[in-house]
């Protein structure tokens, strides 16, 4: 990890932070500093000890995925945000680089996702899995150059929220994400997946909120 998290949005009920690559959202028992630790320390520095204690992440990103992570700051409104997660009321868009030239312009990938029985780290497409939908739109097809293979720059909208959903769905289409060490080929650049934006109606104020995190890499 070589960058500090950045606050993108904050009010009395919600905080959005731009997570850098290499940082985990929740503790894994190793004592490694997490994005939740960062957010809690920031709230304490702002003099808001209650929020620092009550805060809960509303979404999670894999270690190498960058971008928007939302935190609920107030116990009284936490159930409203939890219900929004259940209802898929957050519109989430990701930017990603996929291997190869995708020959369609837009597609709804509708394939159930289950745990991989042969590798506990992985998920897989399988009939026994949970319903999973990912909408993919090709933004640009990048021709091979300077020794780099052909790649596709894509916008991805999550319609459900399964573990590794984007990675599994793109790999199932034979276009794994660039740098994916589980479902594709590991590369020094790391995983090219960025949680770019979140849009929703604020459950307390009724405002339409749109939050964006700048993409840390160029397609």
Region locations from a protein language model:
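Long C-terminal interaction/binding lobes of large macromolecular proteins
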Residues: 136, 154
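A structural micro-motif recognizing beta-strand termini
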Residues: 99, 155-159
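RNA pseudouridine synthases
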Residues: 1-127, 140-143, 147-148, 192, ...
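Well-ordered beta-strand positions in beta-sheet-rich domains
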Residues: 93-95, 106, 110, 133-135, ...
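Pseudouridine synthases involved in rRNA/tRNA modification
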Residues: 1-14, 20-26, 130, 144-151, ...
């Amino acid at each position: 990890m070589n960058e500090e998290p950045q606050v993108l949005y904050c009010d009395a009920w919600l905080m959005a932070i731009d997570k850098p690559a290499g940082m985990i959202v929740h503790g894994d028992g190793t004592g490694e500093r997490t994005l939740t630790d960062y957010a809690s320390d920031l709230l304490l520095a702002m003099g808001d000890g209650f929020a620092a204690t009550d805060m809960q992440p509303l979404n999670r990103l894999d270690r190498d995925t960058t971008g928007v992570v939302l935190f609920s700051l107030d116990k009284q409104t936490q159930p409203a945000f939890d219900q929004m997660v259940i209802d898929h009321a957050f519109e989430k868009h990701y930017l990603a680089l996929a291997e190869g030239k995708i020959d369609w312009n837009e597609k709804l990938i509708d394939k159930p996702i289950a745990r991989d029985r042969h590798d506990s780290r992985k998920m897989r497409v399988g009939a026994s899995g949970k319903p999973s939908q990912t909408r993919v739109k090709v933004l640009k097809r990048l021709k091979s150059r300077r020794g780099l293979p052909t790649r596709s720059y894509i916008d991805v909208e999550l319609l459900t929220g399964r573990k590794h959903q984007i990675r599994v769905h793109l790999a199932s289409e034979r276009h794994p994400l660039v740098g994916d060490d589980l479902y594709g080929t590991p590369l020094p650049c790391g995983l090219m997946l960025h949680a770019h934006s979140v849009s929703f109606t604020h459950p307390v104020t009724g405002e339409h909120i749109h939050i964006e995190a700048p993409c840390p890499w160029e397609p």
